[in-house]
């Protein structure tokens, strides 16, 4: 099962200069809690942008240039990943924008933190087709002068 997890702005802003725009302590703690002891899927740029290793997570990386190491398993494409046994695992898709977009058709669920703010960005979260997903707000929060809500999107079952 693939679950996208991200923090975005009200206009789908995701990142600027290969960095996250918002660093909300409570949201980062939520991210750790949800993804701990699971696989996390990311692109090469997201891997290289991490300030430190995400303890307790197993990395899957999509990259045409990196090679598998003891720290992460590399796939040359999403198609290559989808043909493996990992498809039966709970995998959290953690970015970046291109990986979110490419994984959207295969995603069962999305957990999005949506900040009620806009910001200059050079990377955006893909547009969600509301005919494919049911959404539920699971919480509304305030932190450091920011208001944000957490929404879960679940793919609608085909008739």
For the regions a language model picked out, list residue spans one by one.
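Enzymes that bind and transform nitrogen-containing heteroaromatic metabolites
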Residues: 1-159
């Amino acid at each position: 099962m693939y679950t996208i997890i991200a923090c975005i702005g009200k206009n789908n802003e995701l990142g600027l200069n290969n960095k996250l725009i918002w660093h909300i302590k409570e949201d980062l703690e939520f991210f750790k809690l949800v993804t701990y002891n699971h696989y996390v899927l990311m692109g090469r740029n997201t891997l290289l942008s991490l300030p430190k290793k995400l303890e307790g997570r197993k990395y899957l990386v999509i990259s045409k240039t990196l090679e598998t190491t003891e720290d992460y398993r590399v796939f040359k494409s999403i198609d290559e990943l989808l043909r493996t046994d990992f498809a039966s695992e709970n995998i959290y898709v953690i970015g970046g924008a291109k990986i979110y977009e490419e994984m959207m058709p295969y995603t069962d669920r999305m957990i999005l933190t949506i900040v009620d703010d806009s910001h200059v960005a050079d990377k955006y979260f893909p547009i969600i087709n509301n005919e494919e997903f049911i959404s539920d707000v699971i919480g509304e929060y305030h932190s450091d002068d920011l208001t944000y809500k957490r929404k879960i999107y679940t793919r609608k079952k085909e008739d």
